[in-house]
Curated annotation (Swiss-Prot):
GO terms for biological process: proteolysis. It is found in: Secreted. This is Subtilisin-like protease 4. Glycans are attached at N252, N395. GO terms for molecular function: serine-type endopeptidase activity. Residues 380-392 have a biased composition (Polar residues). The lineage of its organism: Eukaryota, Fungi, Dikarya, Ascomycota, Pezizomycotina.
Length: 399
């Protein structure tokens, strides 16, 4: 079950006043906390000007406390504004945190945590079976049957380890977006290139005509932070808004960490803004409600299936899962050229992101796509898991 605990009106070390913002902490073993790093979320209705005034005040308070006590905290790091859901990430000492919590404009404060990819690399070459499976009611076909519009006019944001945008599988349809993880824009891991190839590659992908945007939020070791993920989501929404493609966009997040209300709130705002959001359920063979962003009810949470139409042994499960998609031994592009096989709910999620773009390209509303995918799905999973839906992704090809 969800393990986020609200400490009512108390910090762990000292009592606080009744009017203070809520301090949320993770008491579950899924969360790997980042010391003295916090995500601060403002109350709904706080104006842009009031938000900027608050940020300026916090920066000043931090500078004063740092000089007074000699702490080595970095202070304000980045701001978020996702369709008026406003907040920021910072590295603060306890005294500055106290001041933040006492501000009536703050809704809640959450400690930042590590987020990791949800994929496992296996051998470098394997038969590709996922495309055939999602375009046929029955297992066994290697043919991918699809409408040739294939996501044309739709943009998919790959929020991941980066993407090799020059890979031949993308046919010039991929562009660079932003990097909230490090100073190296290359995909040194391979995970992001693989997932992008799955959702929109020419050879390996579902939506073969969709545009692709690389949003790097994880480093070469496949890890990042909740604050970095939110910054990436913030970029996606603002980019889509500026380009006038809200309603013609999708987002894939093949990653996860312990439960985070801030992470869930961010993806919910993106989904409600008109970007279809697909997320990996996670790879711990546990209830996905304990993970974020998988536990956000508004997004499409994806579990992994095998070529035998069974639940992948590693896949998370539970009532929050919306749909299964192929995730074991999936072959797709690797950085620098060529291909490789990977397994994980990371590989299942981009099948759904690509299928979402496929439907959006045919006129579907991104806010209704997950429900439409569930209606189209095939009840084929032999052991979906306790309380988990028996729905396998299908594109409605008639095969």
């Amino acid at each position: 079950m969800v393990c986020l605990k609200t400490l009512s009106v108390f910090l762990a070390a000292f009592a606080v006043a009744d009017a203070r913002a809520v301090f949320k902490t993770q008491s579950n073993k899924n969360g790997e906390m980042i010391a003295d790093n916090y995500i601060v979320v403002m109350k709904d209705g706080v104006s842009h000007d009031d938000f900027k005034a608050h940020v300026s005040s916090v920066a000043s308070i931090h500078t004063t406390n740092k000089a007074k006590r000699g702490t080595n905290t970095a202070g304000m790091k980045r701001e978020f504004d996702i369709m008026n859901w406003r907040g920021y990430h910072g590295h603060f000492d306890r005294d500055t945190l106290e001041e933040i919590l006492n501000d009536s404009k703050v809704s809640y404060v959450e400690q930042d945590q590590v987020v990791r990819i949800s994929g496992l690399t296996t051998q470098r070459s394997a038969p590709s079976w996922g495309l055939g499976r999602v375009s046929h009611r029955r297992a066994g076909s290697r043919d991918y049957v699809f409408d040739d519009s294939a996501g044309r006019g739709v943009t998919i944001y790959g929020v991941d380890t980066g993407i090799d945008i020059r890979h031949q599988d993308f046919g010039g349809r991929a562009r660079w977006g932003t990097n909230t993880a490090d100073r190296d824009n290359a995909d040194r891991h391979g995970h992001g290139t693989h997932t992008a190839s799955t959702f929109a590659g020419t050879a390996f992908g579902i939506a073969k005509n969709a545009n692709i945007v690389a949003v790097k939020v994880l480093g070469s070791d496949g890890s990042g932070s909740t604050s970095g993920i939110i910054a990436g989501i913030n970029y996606c929404v603002q980019d889509a808004q500026q380009r006038g493609i809200l309603g013609k966009a999708a987002m894939n997040l093949s990653l996860g960490g312990g439960f985070s209300q801030a992470n869930n709130d961010a993806v919910t705002r993106a989904q409600n803004a008109g970007i279809f959001v697909a997320v990996a359920a996670g790879n711990d063979n546990r209830d996905a409600r304990a993970y974020s962003p998988a536990s956000a009810p508004a997004v499409c949470t994806v579990a992994s299936s095998t070529i035998q139409d069974s639940k992948s042994s590693f896949s998370n499960w539970g009532s929050i899962v919306d749909i299964y998609a192929p995730g074991s031994d999936i072959i797709a592009a690797r950085p620098g050229g060529g291909s490789q096989s990977m397994s994980g709910t990371s590989m299942a999620s981009p099948h759904v992101a690509g299928m979402g773009a496929y439907l959006i390209g045919m006129g579907a509303d991104p806010r209704r796509v997950c429900d439409q995918l569930k209606q189209l799905s095939t009840p084929a999973i032999s052991n979906p898991g306790s309380g988990t839906t028996n729905r396998l992704l299908y594109n409605g090809s008639g095969q």
